């Protein structure tokens, strides 16, 4: 899979915020297997870019393409299939089912497009230190725990790219390192690309390319 951005200009962003960007108003190609870091100061359109990449929002000029096909010409059914099999994501606001248990949040995702066995949920939860939370409602967990839940959930499906929006904002250094290692391990197994957007450089991410939004 290849993601291409051709002269993307958000409808809502001031001109001065797009003039010096490595992304806005540029041609950017992100190939499967590449690890791309996007450093985006507050107000530069980081989360909007993430939503553009995932096809949630289309309030921009220019073209965003999956495998040379404009996302604006992709049908809802095609987009749903792409999200199920090729694109995984950790949203900044996580979007967990707060009244479901942690395990249910993970297992629902796994069963929609099975890639791992259920046993891997326990293994990943152990690696990220949330095994004792699996039977607890997700909404009662701390935000840092919820971030780890969202990361593990995103790793349950097949993907060619995983998109991450400030995935470690509420994690300490030790937990950030563990989470990044797990993400990279799973991406490498699939030969998948990683797109990580954050407010500043992430020292735990071995990016092949850094873009400044």
Model segments located where?
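Conserved ABC ATPase signature
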Residues: 137-145
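Catalytic Walker B motif of ABC-type/P-loop ATPase nucleotide-binding domains
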Residues: 162-166
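Q-loop/switch helix immediately C-terminal to the Walker
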Residues: 93, 99-112
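Conserved ABC transporter NBD signature motif
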Residues: 62-73
